[in-house]
């Protein structure tokens, strides 16, 4: 791997992980309240699962973004990176809406919008780099599961 390629991967992975870490840090109090007081739907995993899964997913997102960034310059590449950044912003704010504001209904609507953005991102990634697109499938599946949990929490609480 070329040094510039290595730096590109490192940047995108670290950037994406940093966004996730900042979101986690900003919601640490809300997360604690959530874990102690919220009625959770069936199939809710233990709290320790979430940071592990998100750490892996943010790394996969970063790898995918790096692959797109390293692709030849094109309109599809630019649109892919823009969608990546937009969905990352939506991802970042979902945690704040859900954990800090405890606005579970609005958080669900926000999450559905994030889900749609992830699908659009996968479609756009696929136009430039199929592997980058495939790397986003676990993210889409996890957000689908998160939507189930979010809706269940909204209904139960």
Model-derived features with residue positions:
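Membrane-interface helix termini and inter-helical loops of multi-pass transporters
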Residues: 29-43, 156
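N-terminal signal-anchor transmembrane alpha helix
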Residues: 3-26
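Membrane-interface helix caps and helix-loop-helix hairpins in membrane proteins
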Residues: 94-106, 127, 151-157
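Interfacial loop-to-transmembrane junctions
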Residues: 123-141
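Hydrophobic alpha-helical transmembrane segments
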Residues: 51-65, 112-115
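Non-cytosolic membrane-interface motifs at loop->transmembrane helix junctions
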Residues: 38-40, 103-113, 135
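Short aromatic-rich membrane-water interface segments that cap or initiate transmembrane helices
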Residues: 40-52
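Membrane-interfacial loop-to-transmembrane alpha-helix junctions, especially the N-terminal start
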Residues: 75-84
């Amino acid at each position: 791997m070329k040094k510039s390629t290595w730096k590109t991967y490192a940047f995108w992975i670290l950037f994406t992980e940093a966004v996730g870490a900042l979101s986690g840090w900003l919601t640490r109090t809300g997360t604690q309240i959530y874990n102690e007081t919220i009625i959770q739907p069936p199939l809710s995993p233990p709290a320790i699962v979430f940071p592990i899964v998100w750490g892996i997913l943010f790394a996969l997102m970063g790898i995918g973004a790096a692959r797109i960034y390293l692709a030849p310059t094109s309109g599809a590449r630019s649109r892919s990176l823009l969608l990546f950044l937009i969905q990352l912003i939506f991802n970042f704010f979902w945690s704040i809406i859900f954990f800090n504001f405890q606005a579970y209904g609005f958080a669900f609507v926000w999450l559905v919008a994030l889900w749609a953005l992830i699908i659009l991102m996968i479609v756009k990634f696929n136009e430039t780099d199929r592997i980058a697109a495939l790397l986003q499938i676990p993210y889409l599946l996890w957000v689908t599961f998160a939507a189930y949990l979010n809706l269940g929490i909204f209904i139960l609480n």
